[in-house]
């Protein structure tokens, strides 16, 4: 039994070959402008496995394993934030960032800890939390070998070795190694300002009594000075 030719006179293998070549040509054209399409999902997976990053940004030379990641990255250079929050108007470069931000308004916490049931808005927060249960401390100091569960804790610790104090007070120019220490220090200035405002408010609302009180203090001070002077005069006699 002889098999007939498919309609159009073109075999299936030839048609697939033309489609594949067409996609390769499109990919080469897109790569010329710093963006390439993913025409082979299997190839993309293999690239991720071997850490190959063929998609390079023409602005900053940063490379990526997928064209979609490069496309999102290029928005940083253009400054275009096309994903806007309907609640507060804040805009983002990526839709994933907007989704995370929206959870502030909705209160949604989709990431749940299997150990204790605590929920989180972001997967990264859940990963950090789970280290409390596992005891994992993957971030170690090169200077003293001390390890931490979070990278931010390691950065703070390393400042004890370097002496770096990046957080500066705008009021008195005093510097601190941690932002929490700066916030604690700022309370001192806040208390001083509120105390000063309270004095000014009393002077405005009760000017006579405030002046009287101030006058009494001045008179009391003069009496003390006079008393001390008279005592010295008596001793000399």
Swiss-Prot record:
Q: Which InterPro entries match?
A: Znf_C2H2_sf, Znf_C2H2_type
ZnF segments: C2H2-type = 55-82, 83-110, 111-138, 139-166, 167-194
What Gene Ontology biological process does one annotation of this record name?
regulation of transcription by RNA polymerase II
Q: According to the lineage, what is the superkingdom?
A: Eukaryota
Task: Supply the alphabetized keyword list.
Answer: Acetylation, DNA-binding, Metal-binding, Nucleus, Repeat, Transcription, Transcription regulation, Zinc, Zinc-finger
Q: Which residues carry this modification: N6-acetyllysine?
A: 18, 23
Q: Where is this region: Disordered?
A: 1-33, 188-218
Question: What role does this protein play?
Answer: Binds DNA through the consensus sequence 5'-CAATG-3'. May be involved in transcriptional regulation and may play a role in tooth formation.
- Record's family? Belongs to the krueppel C2H2-type zinc-finger protein family.
Under which name does UniProt file this protein? Answer: Zinc finger protein 22
- The species this protein was found in: Rattus norvegicus (Rat)
